[in-house]
């Protein structure tokens, strides 16, 4: 046969429109913007090749393996409606290309190399279909939605949280006091800001101690289970684990991690520890906009959210929907369902390119956080439903009477909305009225609404 060296078009090997996808394949939907003069088939095939077995030229060692068994295949290409020179390229990867239980390896393979590719002007990973066979190699969230409700003994409503502000500069003692006031007022959780790690003005161990004190004091006074997301993110994995272990020794219910800056390897280790030791894990998505903000390049957040469900986390920040554009609402709800449900049907109107079956992987609670206020409560309750965490930072701490009354205002607004919904009222239409009625018997809420 003889070995034939030389450069040949990717599409001869990697563009296979007749390919029938297997149940075990990992499927990817890429938004491809080819350079001028590059046909879309070649661009799609180039992505499939470079993210699997291909390189820029035919190599002698190709003969020592079965390319047909291991190569990625671009099996379908469609133009993006309303965009010039943009295509969705669907790529199927054989399962054997990936290490079991490693989100890190999955991303290194699929997005590690292709994004700097010359033939492409831009590239965005829009969605992934994770096959059941691969899902089963992951532990996933340490506990999941149902176990969390049982641990906290809170049912039939969204959970309430608050990020402690000012995020940097408070001493540990004052920080603990702010935590206590919010929890005492009626919140379920308070939160370390994502950039609170262990800085000179507040070392992590001091913060953990004072926050634990705040938790136990507020629990004793309210008769409710309380928590504070203690941020265990650190410069090394060993230090991160040390912080998580200390949190467990204090007996607190939940810790926190920045999963993109901390990295998937660290996150998965922490998630395993949390399941083994009964800690809930709150995940913050700091740095996500660097990756997901551009419409034509990067990775869509729904992929990062799927990856987090595999790596492990019980809560993850997922945007707020409120006050944003209408179109974003459906897209956001699409990945909120991807986080919570066992089975999600393909639905392009919500940005879901593939049907995803999570089998028995626990669900993740979406966290709505950022610029929300008591007036948003009816909309948030309606949009996110019971299985969510609503976080009001400035919306709690910005109350004219202080933190505890701010917490009271949020809790009253939430309970009023849940009750109204259970009585069959339409939160979307009557939301403002429901809040106004509640103001009559809650001076704290009335003050917050002024």
From Swiss-Prot:
Q: Does the keyword Protein transport apply?
A: no
The record's comment on cofactor binding reads: Binds 1 Mg(2+) ion per subunit.
Quick check: keyword Lyase in the entry? yes
Chief location: plastid
Query: How is the protein altered post-translationally, as described in the entry?
Result: The disulfide bond which can form in the large chain dimeric partners within the hexadecamer appears to be associated with oxidative stress and protein turnover.
GO BP annotations of the record are: photorespiration; reductive pentose-phosphate cycle
Keywords, alphabetical: Calvin cycle, Carbon dioxide fixation, Chloroplast, Disulfide bond, Lyase, Magnesium, Metal-binding, Methylation, Monooxygenase, Oxidoreductase, Photorespiration, Photosynthesis, Plastid
Q: What is this enzyme's catalytic activity, as reactions?
A: 2 (2R)-3-phosphoglycerate + 2 H(+) = D-ribulose 1,5-bisphosphate + CO2 + H2O; D-ribulose 1,5-bisphosphate + O2 = 2-phosphoglycolate + (2R)-3-phosphoglycerate + 2 H(+)
> Where along this sequence does the record place binding of Mg(2+)?
191, 193-194
Question: What does the record give as cofactor?
Answer: Mg(2+)
SUPFAM superfamilies (UniProt xref) = RuBisCo, C-terminal domain (SSF51649), RuBisCO, large subunit, small (N-terminal) domain (SSF54966)
Q: What is its EC number?
A: 4.1.1.39
PTM annotation (N6,N6,N6-trimethyllysine): residues: 4
Which residues carry the post-translational modification N6-carboxylysine, per the record?
191
- PANTHER family in the record, alphabetically? RIBULOSE BISPHOSPHATE CARBOXYLASE, RIBULOSE BISPHOSPHATE CARBOXYLASE LARGE CHAIN
Quaternary structure? Heterohexadecamer of 8 large chains and 8 small chains; disulfide-linked. The disulfide link is formed within the large subunit homodimers.
What protein name is recorded for this chain? Ribulose bisphosphate carboxylase large chain
Show the taxonomic lineage: Eukaryota, Viridiplantae, Streptophyta, Embryophyta, Tracheophyta
